[in-house]
């Protein structure tokens, strides 16, 4: 999960709309939220970020640059719908949507003590995608 990217506005807005939290609350959270990630995710929220990293990695393997992709999405009631676009745009939107919905489901696991968590404290095996 990287919040310093071109799709920051869309992903950040999605996070705010679905969770009520600032998108910055997830930047630097645990072992996976923010730039890179390794070892064992700390909790369900961190697992959402690991899954998001895996989703982006899959897009990159198909020659897409998800961190540079911009997309449109719509919020109808509480439902996110990705707009039309090329496969990279729609794929990036789908990854971001899945992460945001995961954050919403994992809201009870969120711990302030994992904000800006030192990556050097991350332990265990890195799970596969």
Stretches found by the model and what they are:
Residues 1-129:
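Extended terminal accessory/targeting regions
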């Amino acid at each position: 999960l990287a919040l310093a990217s071109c799709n920051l506005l869309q992903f950040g807005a999605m996070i705010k709309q679905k969770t009520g939290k600032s998108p910055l609350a997830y930047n630097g959270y645990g072992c996976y939220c923010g730039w890179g990630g390794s070892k064992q995710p700390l909790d369900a929220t961190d697992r959402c970020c690991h899954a998001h990293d895996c989703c982006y990695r899959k897009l990159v393997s198909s020659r897409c640059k998800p961190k540079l992709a911009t997309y449109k999405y719509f919020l109808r009631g509480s439902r996110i719908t990705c707009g039309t676009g090329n496969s990279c745009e729609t794929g990036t939107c789908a990854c971001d949507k899945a992460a945001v919905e995961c954050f919403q489901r994992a809201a009870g696991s969120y711990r302030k003590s994992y904000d800006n968590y030192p990556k050097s404290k991350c332990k265990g095996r890195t799970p596969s995608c």
